[in-house]
C-alpha cells in the first residue's frame, strides 16, 4: 500500500510574518533580513557604493525603475531637468505701533493743504437783477386728432362646427341626400352638409362574423402539447380510474370533490410517506388532462410535477412525468369485398328487383338452404328448417343466415313451384300402419317438415332434393 504524503501548506509572505513576529521575537531567521534589507547581497551593494557611484544606473535593491532619471540608452545623453522658478510675492512691511499711538487706523492719508472750495458771492445794495412776473388766463388746448382719414374698427367671429351645441342641430331623415341649411343661434353660424350613403364591400359571409383588422389567411392550427420530449419521463397507467379519480394514485384520502379537468395541487410529501401507486411518488402537481392521438390510439394524458429538492433561494426542483392511458385503438378501415349483381338468367325477369316490403306469396317460395325455425299450420308450431336462399319467379335473392345447428347443405338446381293458392297437404299425425308409396314421375321435392330434427341426436345426412328417381316411404 502506497502512503500518500500530506500536502504542504504554503507559508505566509515575509511581510505578513514580520508584522506579527517582530514584536513577539519569534520571527524565522530569514524574515527580518529580507524585510529590513540586511541580507548579504544588500550589504555588498552598500559597501560597494561607498567607492563606486552607481546611482545613474539604478543598480540596487530598489524597485528597478532606473533611479530618478530612468533608464537611458547607451551612447546617449540623459535628459536635463529644467526647474521653472515661481515668482515670489513681495513681503509686507510691518510697521510697529507704539503704546502712545492711536488705535484707530485712518483710511485717508494726512495732508496739510485743505481745499475749501469756491466762495459764495454776496449781493449788497439795491442794484442787481430785476425780477418780472407774468400771468396768462388762456388754457392750453392740445389737438390729439391725427391728420388723415378716420379708422373704423370691426370684429369677426369664426365658429367651429365641431363644438356647436347638439340640441340646435336638426338631424335629417334616414336616406335623405338633399342639402340642408341649419340655422341656429347667431354664434352657431350657417352650415350646409350632405349625407352620403355608404356601400358595403363584403363579398362573402352573412355579416355576423367577427371583424378582424388583421385576418389570418388560411386555417391556423393550434399547437398541441409537447408531451414526448427528452425532459419528460413517459409512464403508462393501465388503471382506468386515472380518468375520473387521478388523486387516488397520490394520496389515500377520498375527497368529496375531485376535479377531472383542472390542475390538482397536492401538499409536499413528508419523508417516508407511502403512496398508493409507486409511479406517483413525490408528485405535488397534476396538470389538467389532454386528449391526443398517438400511433393509432386515443390517449388520455396528464403531466405531473415532482418535488425532489429545494434550493437555498426557495426554488423547488423536480422531474416532470407524462402519465398517459390509452382509451381505444383506432383500427384501419376494413375493406369489404362486394359481390357483383349479375342479371337473372330468365329474360322475363331482367328488370325485376327484390323489394323487402313487397307482398310475396308464400306458395311461390322454395327453401333451398339450411337453418332452424318454426312453421305454423292451423295453430300448431312445427319445427322446420328455413332456407338461406329464396327462389321466386321474380329472381333469386340470397339472404345470409347463421344457424346454431350443423345442417348439411347440398347444392342443387333451383326449383320453381307452380303458382298455387294452397300449400301441399301435410297430415297432422302419421298413420298407424306403414304404407309404401311409390312415386314415378318427373322432378319433385320433399317438404322439409316431414323430417323432424331431434336436438339430442345427431342429425343424419339426408338429401332433401332429388331428381328423376323412385322414393319409397
Swiss-Prot record:
- Keywords assigned: Capsid protein, Cytoplasmic inwards viral transport, Disulfide bond, DNA-binding, Host endosome, Host Golgi apparatus, Host nucleus, Host-virus interaction, Late protein, Microtubular inwards viral transport, Phosphoprotein, Viral penetration into host nucleus, Virion, Virus entry into host cell
Q: Where is this motif: Nuclear localization signal?
A: 1-12, 452-462
Query: Can you provide one Gene Ontology molecular function annotated for this UniProt record?
Result: DNA binding
Q: Name one GO biological process term.
A: symbiont entry into host cell
What about PTM?
Highly phosphorylated.
Report the InterPro entries cross-referenced here.
Late_L2 (IPR000784)
Q: Which Pfam families match?
A: Late_protein_L2 (PF00513)
**GO cellular component terms?**
host cell; host cell endosome; host cell Golgi apparatus; host cell nucleus; viral capsid
What is its subcellular localisation?
Virion; Host nucleus; Host early endosome; Host Golgi apparatus
* Disulphide bridges, residue numbers: 21-27
Similarity remark: Belongs to the papillomaviridae L2 protein family.
User: What job does the chain carry out?
Assistant: Minor protein of the capsid that localizes along the inner surface of the virion, within the central cavities beneath the L1 pentamers. Plays a role in capsid stabilization through interaction with the major capsid protein L1. Once the virion enters the host cell, L2 escorts the genomic DNA into the nucleus by promoting escape from the endosomal compartments and traffic through the host Golgi network.
Quaternary structure?
Interacts with major capsid protein L1. Interacts with E2; this interaction inhibits E2 transcriptional activity but not the DNA replication function E2. Interacts with host GADD45GIP1. Interacts with host HSPA8; this interaction is required for L2 nuclear translocation. Interacts with host importins KPNB2 and KPNB3. Forms a complex with importin alpha2-beta1 heterodimers via interaction with the importin alpha2 adapter. Interacts with host DYNLT1; this interaction is essential for virus intracellular transport during entry.
Write the protein's name.
Answer: Minor capsid protein L2
Q: Its encoding gene is what?
A: L2
Amino acid at each position: 500500500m502506497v502512503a500518500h504524503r500530506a500536502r504542504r501548506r504554503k507559508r505566509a509572505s515575509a511581510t505578513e510574518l514580520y508584522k506579527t513576529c517582530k514584536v513577539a521575537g519569534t520571527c524565522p531567521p530569514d524574515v527580518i533580513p529580507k524585510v529590513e534589507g540586511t541580507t548579504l547581497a544588500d550589504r555588498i551593494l552598500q559597501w560597494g557604493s561607498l567607492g563606486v557611484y552607481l546611482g545613474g544606473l539604478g543598480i540596487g535593491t530598489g524597485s528597478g525603475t532606473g533611479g530618478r532619471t530612468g533608464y537611458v540608452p547607451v551612447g546617449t545623453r540623459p535628459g536635463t531637468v529644467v526647474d521653472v522658478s515661481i515668482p515670489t510675492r513681495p513681503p509686507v512691511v510691518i510697521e510697529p505701533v507704539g503704546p502712545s499711538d492711536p488705535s484707530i487706523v485712518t483710511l485717508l492719508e494726512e495732508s496739510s493743504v485743505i481745499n475749501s472750495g469756491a466762495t459764495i458771492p454776496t449781493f449788497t445794495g439795491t442794484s442787481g437783477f430785476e425780477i418780472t412776473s407774468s400771468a396768462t388766463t388762456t388754457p392750453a388746448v392740445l389737438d390729439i386728432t391725427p391728420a388723415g382719414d378716420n379708422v373704423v374698427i370691426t370684429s369677426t367671429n369664426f365658429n367651429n362646427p365641431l363644438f356647436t351645441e347638439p340640441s340646435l342641430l336638426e338631424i335629417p331623415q334616414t336616406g335623405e341626400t338633399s342639402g340642408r341649411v341649419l340655422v341656429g343661434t347667431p354664434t352657431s353660424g350657417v352650415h350646409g352638409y350632405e349625407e352620403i350613403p355608404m356601400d358595403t364591400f363584403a363579398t362573402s359571409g352573412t355579416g355576423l362574423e367577427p371583424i378582424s383588422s388583421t385576418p389570418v389567411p388560411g386555417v391556423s392550427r393550434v399547437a398541441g402539447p409537447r408531451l414526448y420530449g427528452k425532459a419528460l419521463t413517459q409512464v403508462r397507467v393501465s388503471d382506468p380510474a386515472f380518468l375520473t379519480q387521478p388523486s387516488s394514485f397520490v394520496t389515500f384520502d377520498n375527497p368529496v370533490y375531485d376535479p377531472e379537468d383542472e390542475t390538482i395541487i397536492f401538499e409536499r410529501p413528508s419523508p417516508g410517506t407511502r403512496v398508493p401507486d409507486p409511479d406517483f411518488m413525490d408528485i405535488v402537481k397534476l396538470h389538467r388532462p389532454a386528449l391526443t392521438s398517438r400511433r393509432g390510439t386515443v390517449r388520455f394524458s396528464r403531466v405531473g410535477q415532482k418535488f425532489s429538492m429545494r434550493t437555498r433561494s426557495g426554488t423547488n426542483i423536480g422531474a416532470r412525468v407524462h402519465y398517459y392511458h390509452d382509451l381505444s385503438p383506432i383500427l384501419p378501415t376494413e375493406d369489404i369485398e362486394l359481390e357483383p349483381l349479375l342479371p337473372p338468367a330468365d329474360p322475363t325477369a331482367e328488370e325485376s328487383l327484390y323489394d323487402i316490403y313487397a307482398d310475396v306469396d308464400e306458395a311461390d317460395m322454395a327453401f333451398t338452404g339450411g337453418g332452424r325455425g318454426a312453421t305454423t299450420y292451423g295453430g300448431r308450431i312445427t319445427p322446420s328448417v328455413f332456407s338461406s336462399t329464396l327462389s321466386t319467379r321474380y329472381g333469386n335473392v340470397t339472404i345470409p343466415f347463421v344457424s346454431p345447428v350443423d345442417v348439411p347443405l347440398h347444392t342443387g338446381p333451383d326449383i320453381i313451384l307452380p303458382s298455387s293458392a294452397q300449400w301441399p297437404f301435410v297430415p297432422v299425425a302419421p298413420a298407424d300402419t306403414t304404407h309404401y308409396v311409390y312415386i314415378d314421375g318427373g322432378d319433385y321435392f320433399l317438404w322439409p317438415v316431414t323430417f323432424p330434427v331431434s336436438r339430442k341426436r345427431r342429425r343424419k345426412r339426408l338429401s332433401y332434393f332429388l331428381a328423376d328417381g323412385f322414393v319409397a316411404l
